[in-house]
UniProtKB/Swiss-Prot annotation:
Ranges where the VPS28 N-terminal domain occurs: 1-99
Protein encoded by which gene: VPS28-2
Function noted in UniProt: Component of the ESCRT-I complex (endosomal sorting complex required for transport I), a regulator of vesicular trafficking process. Required for the sorting of endocytic ubiquitinated cargos into multivesicular bodies (MVBs). Mediates the association to the ESCRT-0 complex.
Family: Belongs to the VPS28 family.
Name assigned to this protein: Vacuolar protein sorting-associated protein 28 homolog 2
Main location as per UniProt: other
Length: 210
């Protein structure tokens, strides 16, 4: 019986392995989106898993940009029927919790720990830029964590500078590839926005008791 090869060389084999991985990421994202919509997963777990899938997707789609220039066509070719995943990965590029963040009311008992979390996330984000950690897959998770912690704090209004600035940066980064890096100008601007938002955040804290 003659052996049938699925690929002709190592490069072709890697391509098909990448296809399989892309297929798996899209399917996993669709499953995650449905679980979130049906309240089968809590928002923080959803956000963490969704961020990982988005970063993996960005890295893989950058690798496959020549062989898979159109992700929707790839999904159609393999009859995937994953509209929620395609929206999340291709159109939005942000977890639903970041895109449609509902202000989470924090009780007095846990507001102090949330404030500490916000401060830590601000400092970590600013320090990472000073250490020249400027790749999208390095910056995006830090800003996403910061955005999430700010949205937990009920004393901050929806239009608080830090919230709007982080949302703008997350949206901008989501349109870039995972391996892309911020330019020196972008890095300086982001650091400035973080510092400005941090100062506004600290100024807002005394209002917590009002």
């Amino acid at each position: 019986m003659m052996e049938v090869k699925l690929w002709n060389d190592k490069r072709e084999r890697e391509m098909y392995e990448n296809f399989a991985e892309l297929f798996a990421i899209i399917k996993a994202t669709e499953k995650l989106e449905k679980a979130y919509i049906r309240d089968l997963i809590n928002p923080s777990e959803y956000e963490s898993e969704c961020q990982k899938l988005i970063v993996h997707f960005k890295t893989l789609s950058a690798t496959l940009k020549d062989t898979v220039p159109n992700i929707e066509r790839f999904a159609d070719t393999y009859k995937m029927d994953c509209p929620a995943a395609l929206y999340r990965l291709v159109t939005s590029g942000l977890p639903a919790t970041v895109e449609h963040r509902a202000t989470v009311a924090a009780s007095t008992s846990n507001s102090a720990s949330i404030v500490a979390e916000c401060v830590q996330n601000f400092i970590t984000s600013m320090d990472s830029l000073k250490l020249n950690m400027v790749a999208v897959d390095q910056v995006y998770p830090l800003l996403s964590d910061l955005s999430a912690s700010l949205n937990k704090l009920s004393i901050l209004p929806p239009d608080f500078e830090g919230k709007t600035k982080m949302k703008e940066w997350l949206s901008r980064l989501s349109k870039m590839g995972a391996a892309d890096e911020l330019t020196e100008q972008q890095s300086r601007q982001l650091h400035f926005d973080l510092e400005s938002s941090y100062n506004s955040f600290m100024a807002a804290l005394p209002k917590a008791g009002n």
